[in-house]
From Swiss-Prot:
Binding site for [2Fe-2S] cluster: 122, 153, 213, 285
NCBIfam families: bioB
TM spans (from-to): none
SMART domains, per the entry: BATS, Elp3
UniProtKB keywords: 2Fe-2S, 4Fe-4S, Biotin biosynthesis, Iron, Iron-sulfur, Metal-binding, S-adenosyl-L-methionine, Transferase
Function: Catalyzes the conversion of dethiobiotin (DTB) to biotin by the insertion of a sulfur atom into dethiobiotin via a radical-based mechanism.
Name of encoding gene: bioB
Cofactor binding, note field: Binds 1 [4Fe-4S] cluster. The cluster is coordinated with 3 cysteines and an exchangeable S-adenosyl-L-methionine.
EC number assigned by the record: 2.8.1.6
Protein name, per record: Biotin synthase
SUPFAM superfamilies, per database record: Radical SAM enzymes
Domain of life of the organism encoding this protein: Bacteria
Metal-binding keyword on record: yes
């Protein structure tokens, strides 16, 4: 296992990654250690942002932002106990259960998303994992969205062997299955699903040649070490995810995490920067929690290497800035949709 200590010592001077060879060395290394990511997170803010922006420019259009839209195609009634989730059946959050949407309803939503500028359409379902009849319905939805010329993504929970292949055959481009947090902190948030279940599902997705969308949530009461552990785990996947959504906890009344102290927004920006440095080719997505961020914090996230957002006024069951707000912010910052 190769350590990043030599690279991090160079980072202290604020010049790391101005040399492309260092970025190549970083990307080709097999693993990130938690201690090394924690050292990144502890850098002076300006140095960390500079390094992240330098890496970002080596691999991406510096001013391009990919727009994705997320739709809940089956809402509420989930049997899991994820402490952050308003869709868990055991919590009283006011979320109404909704049966899986029809093909016509999904096509209508996807058409609207495309007209608003989205290039990727993600469909989420609140269950532990899909049954075969659910997979068959999802393949119809995926094919219909694909026919509109959009990239397709689905987040359906734990996949059984063979299910990912069916989704791939229907035209699925990305499968989302987040790790949520570090292995060490995981048990504080979820007890009904093992961490290994998540890794096994990611293996199923990779085995079907579907692109991986995998990230986590920060602000759940975890330590900086735990945030470093999440990023190290993601960056050490082989290969690391093509898409990395970083969520800022949205506290929903009725969930166990409601009312905990909020994470300092600058710590969220640091997490974005560390994700960019450790996974240079990935799309790093600002996901849930943007509505509670100022425009200035969002701008810092883009500077730190975020180059994707969820676009639309709702993410599953939680609020999101509306498309007009986002369009105005992108224009203000001189950013453009990819």
């Amino acid at each position: 296992m190769e350590s990043r200590t030599d690279l991090i010592s160079e980072k202290q001077c604020g010049c790391t990654y101005s040399n492309p060879d260092l970025a190549v060395q970083q990307e080709s290394s097999s693993r990130w250690l938690v201690a090394d990511v924690e050292s990144l997170l502890g850098l002076p803010f300006n140095d960390l942002i500079f390094q992240a922006q330098t890496v970002h420019r080596q691999y991406h259009d510096a001013n391009g932002v990919q727009l994705s839209t997320l739709l809940s195609v089956k809402t509420g009634g989930c049997s899991e106990d994820c402490a952050y989730c308003p869709q868990a059946a055991r919590y009283h959050t006011g979320v109404e259960n909704q049966a899986i949407l029809s093909r016509e309803e999904v096509v209508m939503a996807a058409t609207k998303a495309k007209e608003s500028g989205a290039t990727r359409f993600c469909m989420g379902a609140a269950w532990r994992g899909p049954k075969q009849r659910d997979i068959e319905h999802m393949t119809e939805l995926i094919s219909a969205v694909k026919d509109l010329g959009l990239e397709t993504c689905a987040t359906l929970g734990i996949l059984k062997p063979g299910q990912a292949v069916q989704l791939k055959q229907a035209g699925l481009d990305y499968y989302n299955h987040n790790l949520d947090t570090s292995p060490e902190f995981y048990g504080e948030v979820i007890t009904t699903r093992e961490y290994q279940n998540r890794l096994d599902t990611l293996d199923e997705v990779r085995g079907a040649n579907i692109n991986v969308c995998c990230g986590g949530i920060v602000g759940m009461g975890e330590s900086r070490t735990a945030r470093a552990g999440l990023i190290a785990q993601l960056a050490s996947l082989d290969p690391y995810p093509e898409s990395v959504p970083i969520n800022y906890l949205v506290q929903v009344e009725g969930t166990p995490l409601y009312g905990i102290p909020e994470l300092d927004p600058f710590e969220f920006v640091r997490s974005i920067a560390a994700a960019r440095i450790t996974m240079p080719r990935a799309k790093v997505r600002l996901s849930a929690g943007r509505r509670q961020m100022s425009e200035a914090i969002q701008a810092l996230c883009f500077l730190a290497g975020a180059n994707s957002i969820f676009y639309g006024d709702k993410l599953l069951t939680t609020g999101n800035p509306d498309t007009e707000q986002d369009a105005a912010l992108l224009e203000k910052l001189g950013l453009h949709a990819l």
